[in-house]
Swiss-Prot record:
The gene is rpl15e. It holds the Pfam family Ribosomal_L15e. Belongs to the eukaryotic ribosomal protein eL15 family. One of its GO terms (biological process) is cytoplasmic translation. Keywords: Ribonucleoprotein, Ribosomal protein. The keyword RNA-binding does not apply. This is Large ribosomal subunit protein eL15. GO terms for molecular function: RNA binding; structural constituent of ribosome. It comes from the Archaea. The keyword Ribosomal protein applies. It comes from Nanoarchaeum equitans (strain Kin4-M).
Length: 190
């Protein structure tokens, strides 16, 4: 087994295998702001699998997202009892939210991918890989040149990243996936 396989095995159950180091990380991350730029990836195996290389023009950002559903505003007018609910499920998954927040802070970059790095009872942390497509170190490399295409601009906001495609049901096709294309909104009437 190579190095990355061992790193991957550690993160199958980080509380057990990383122990005190994992707890210390979580405690430190709680004190930090929600979006922090990091020097090097916490999980090198996931970062390299998603296309990370230590080049100028590539950044890694750790994003904190609150877990759970969201509360709506209190309904002021009269309603029948069944309609009186304040909690609604999110329309997107937490990883997609983390990618969007990272990209809103770094508007000149595009999201390459993201991965889970930790969680506690209240928060989840994701590391998001951001690429500047107009940096010469990036657009001169064949593995990143596709980010220059017009249809990849603002890709995270249009559901084109891996985690967004997974949430939208676009990872599979054929039997059972008839109504996920072009989108759920196009196929299901409200």
């Amino acid at each position: 087994m190579g190095l990355y396989q061992y790193v991957r095995a550690l993160y199958k159950d980080p509380k057990e295998f990383l122990g005190e180091l994992y707890k210390q990380r979580i405690q430190q991350w709680r004190r930090e702001p929600p979006i922090v730029e990091v020097e090097r990836p916490t999980r090198i195996d996931r970062a390299r699998a998603l296309g990370y290389k230590p080049l100028p023009g590539i950044k890694i950002v750790r994003v904190r997202v609150r877990k759970g559903t969201r509360k709506r505003e209190e309904i002021k007018g009269g309603r029948r009892p069944k309609a009186e609910y304040r909690i609604r499920p999110l329309g997107v998954n937490l990883q997609w939210i983390a990618e969007e927040r990272a990209n809103r802070l770094h508007r000149n970059m595009e999201v390459l991918g993201s991965y889970w790095v930790g969680e506690d009872g209240l928060y989840k942390w994701y590391e998001v890989i951001l690429v500047d497509p107009f940096n010469p170190n990036i657009y001169n490399r064949p593995e990143y040149v596709w980010l220059l295409q017009k249809n990849q601009r603002g890709r995270v906001f249009r559901g084109k990243t891996s985690s967004a495609r997974k949430f939208r049901g676009l990872r599979n096709g054929g039997l059972g996936a008839e109504k996920v294309r072009p989108s759920k909104r196009a196929n299901f009437k409200d």
